[in-house]
């Protein structure tokens, strides 16, 4: 019997030692130590053992109870379903420091007081990762080429700088060092100027025109007079300004080269129809309205397929937009149908003093059932400034042919006619006399040797040949009795409607219904 009591007492001592080891582990964890394996598990010193033995002296053999049944082999916790292990049923034990009760093990740090940190250690700020503060990550974007080339720190600015610009190249980097290295490597290989870093607030992403993008001046801040008036909290928003009133020769050459070099990559809102000397733009839905306006002013558009909200043509002349709206509401009586604008135009002509001649347009509006754009191919651009007059003559001849073909169409409705623009659509009824007179008046006004803003003998010669082929006569008072017209071999060369196109667009058009005559 005595041996059993000794064994039970020895077991109790071991349990107390185990509790002390657990208390040390909890204290080490509270002090920030995460390496439990480095904590040496050794027996208590003889002094602590004596304290334990002295504490056990208060227990009698009758107070010793057997260890409750465990839930599984190897587990150190008792069965939670047995009420005998609840803290209120266990007797207090005496440790070397204070009287501890089993309920202390349910408190934070098992009831062991944690020493306060000194003031010197409190001035050391915790790391961001330990304090839970999120590290903001900034990406950097290098726009290698284009009108807004540079290094950006904002994706919104980068997207605005590259959207709608054909052939632009850009890439994302994690650090400014990588972005700068990539930009310097590109500029060195291309032998161009070093790219600048453009912060978010300093990016100028909406130049007045595509052609002037490379030379757009930096944005000037408004200077406010503060004497007697309060400065507004923010600069007033500028009014919507689309383009300069006149297109320059540099603008035209920029758009001309853009059309010749466009291969269809990077922009699915347009494609080109390429001839031997010129490439014309075909704009689809969601095309950039500013580029549509500039190409219209340059006479370099063949077809426009606008969206239902007509956002692509919002910068075209107001009377042209109104004619399109009337066609949808009064002619076809449906604003949801897809339509097209087929344009035949001349190109501008310049002199040393500036712009001499603005393009003249004949525009056909109709309902487009199907558009199959062909693949755009990059063409060789060899045009020089001295070649612009020859190109203007060629487009002028094609314009005259398109205008004369209206005489063969018996069912036409004139939507709008102005000094240099005629807008018409097909009709299911015969052309009324009012529309016929409008077409004839427009033809008499523009079909002359002064079509391009100056007397051109080549244009006179072309008109003479075309009219005589139809059985008519033509004389020009600028030419000596109509016989001193320059017999230019280049004007006689080529097929009936200019150079043969290298590819064409396939489209099916529906004939719109009739409507009453619209008064402009």
Curated annotation (Swiss-Prot):
It comes from the Viruses. GO terms for cellular component: host cell cytoplasm. Pfam families: Cauli_VI. Residues 487-520 are annotated as: Disordered. It is found in: Host cytoplasm. The keyword Membrane does not apply. InterPro entries: Ribosomal_bL9/RNase_H1_N (IPR009027), RNase_H1_N (IPR011320), RNase_H1_N_sf (IPR037056). Gene3D superfamilies: Ribonuclease H1, N-terminal domain. GO terms for biological process: regulation of translation; viral translational termination-reinitiation. The keyword Cytoplasm does not apply. Keywords: Host cytoplasm, Translation regulation. Belongs to the caulimoviridae viroplasmin family. Enhances the ribosomal termination-reinitiation event leading to the translation of major open reading frames on the polycistronic viral RNAs. The inclusion bodies are the site of viral DNA synthesis, virion assembly and accumulation in the infected cell. This is Transactivator/viroplasmin protein. It comes from Cauliflower mosaic virus (strain CM-1841).
């Amino acid at each position: 019997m005595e041996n059993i009591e000794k064994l039970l007492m020895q077991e109790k001592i071991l349990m107390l030692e185990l509790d002390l080891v657990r208390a040390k582990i909890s204290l080490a964890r509270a002090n920030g130590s995460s390496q439990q394996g480095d904590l040496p598990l050794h027996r208590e010193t003889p002094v602590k053992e004596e304290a334990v033995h002295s504490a056990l002296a208060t227990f009698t053999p009758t107070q010793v109870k057997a260890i409750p049944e465990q839930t599984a082999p190897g587990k150190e916790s008792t069965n939670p379903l047995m009420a005998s292990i609840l803290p209120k049923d266990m007797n207090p034990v005496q440790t070397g420091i204070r009287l501890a009760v089993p309920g202390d093990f349910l408190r934070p740090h098992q009831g062991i007081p944690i020493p306060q940190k000194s003031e010197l250690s409190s001035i050391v700020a915790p790391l961001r990762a330990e304090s839970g503060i999120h590290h903001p990550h900034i990406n950097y974007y290098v726009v290698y080429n284009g009108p807004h080339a540079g290094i950006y720190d904002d994706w919104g600015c980068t997207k605005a700088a590259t959207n709608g610009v054909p052939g632009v190249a850009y890439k994302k980097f994690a650090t400014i060092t990588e972005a700068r290295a990539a930009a310097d490597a590109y500029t060195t290989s291309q032998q161009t100027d070093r790219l600048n870093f453009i912060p978010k607030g300093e990016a100028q992403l909406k130049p007045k025109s595509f052609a002037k993008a490379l030379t757009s001046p930096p944005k000037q801040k408004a200077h406010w007079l503060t004497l007697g008036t309060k400065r507004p909290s923010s600069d007033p928003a500028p009014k919507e300004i689309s383009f300069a009133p006149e297109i320059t020769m540099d603008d035209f050459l920029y758009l001309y080269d853009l059309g010749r070099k466009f291969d269809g990559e990077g922009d699915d809102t347009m494609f080109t129809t390429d001839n031997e000397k010129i490439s014309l733009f075909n704009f689809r839905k969601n095309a950039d309205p500013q580029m549509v306006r500039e190409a219209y002013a340059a006479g370099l558009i063949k077809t426009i397929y606008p969206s239902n909200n007509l956002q692509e043509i919002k910068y075209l002349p107001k009377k042209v937009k109104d004619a399109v709206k009337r066609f949808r509401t009064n002619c076809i009586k449906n604003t949801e149908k897809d339509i097209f604008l087929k344009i035949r135009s001349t190109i501008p002509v310049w002199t040393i003093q500036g712009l001499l001649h603005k393009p003249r347009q004949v525009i056909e509006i109709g309902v487009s059932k199907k558009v199959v754009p062909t693949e755009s191919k990059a063409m060789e651009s060899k045009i020089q400034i001295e070649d612009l007059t020859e190109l203007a003559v060629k487009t002028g001849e094609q314009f005259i042919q398109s205008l004369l073909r209206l005489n063969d169409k018996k069912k036409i409705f004139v939507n709008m006619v102005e000094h240099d623009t005629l807008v018409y659509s097909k009709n299911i009824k015969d052309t009324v006399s009012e529309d016929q007179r409008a077409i004839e008046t427009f033809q008499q006004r523009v079909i002359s040797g002064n079509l391009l803003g100056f007397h051109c003998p080549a244009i006179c010669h072309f008109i003479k040949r075309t009219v005589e082929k139809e059985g008519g006569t033509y004389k020009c008072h600028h030419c000596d009795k109509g016989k001193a017209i320059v017999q230019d071999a280049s004007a006689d060369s080529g097929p009936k409607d200019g150079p043969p196109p290298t590819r064409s667009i396939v489209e099916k058009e529906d004939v719109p219904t009739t409507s009453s005559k619209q008064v402009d």
